[in-house]
Amino acid sequence: MSKRNQVSYVRPAEPAFLSRFKRQVGYREGPTVETKREQLPLADSDSENGSDNEDEQPQVVTLKKGDLTAEEAMKIKQQIKEALKSSEQDGEPESADGKIMFRKPAKRSSEKVLDFNVSSSKKMKKTKKTDREATSSQSTAKQVKNSSLLSFDDEENDD
């Protein structure tokens, strides 16, 4: 075994004068490789859904007779939640942040034909093959005509 794999870096102890100077200045050390490898704490699911706690709810103030009341605001909020739940059940969850969510398209069954002009791959291969045969017979006829037009080889043979 080579000893190269067993090499590791050991950070030397910081001198006393540097540690005193950093303490006086208020220096904080930046992120290291070890701090970047640490797992971040997971965010609560409540924070993603908005402010659900009562103390975080918006305050409703009615100044005029036609203003929105607290009860009406709660009804609207319930309608929005129901609409989000129904859209998630439909398979199209939309983000409230406005972020675009990418998802794999649903696979189509071979039985379901979307367009009447679409044919199977076997038919397409057969038609391409017949087209090639037709064009190849035409191209050989053109090559015969063109060979008589250019007769450089014939002149060399005559000499």
UniProtKB/Swiss-Prot annotation:
Region (Disordered): 23-68, 80-159
Residue ranges, compositional bias (Acidic residues): 45-57
Protein name: Uncharacterized protein KIAA1143 homolog
Entries under PANTHER family matching the protein: GEO02494P1
Composition bias type Polar residues, residue spans: 135-150
Annotated source species: Gallus gallus (Chicken)
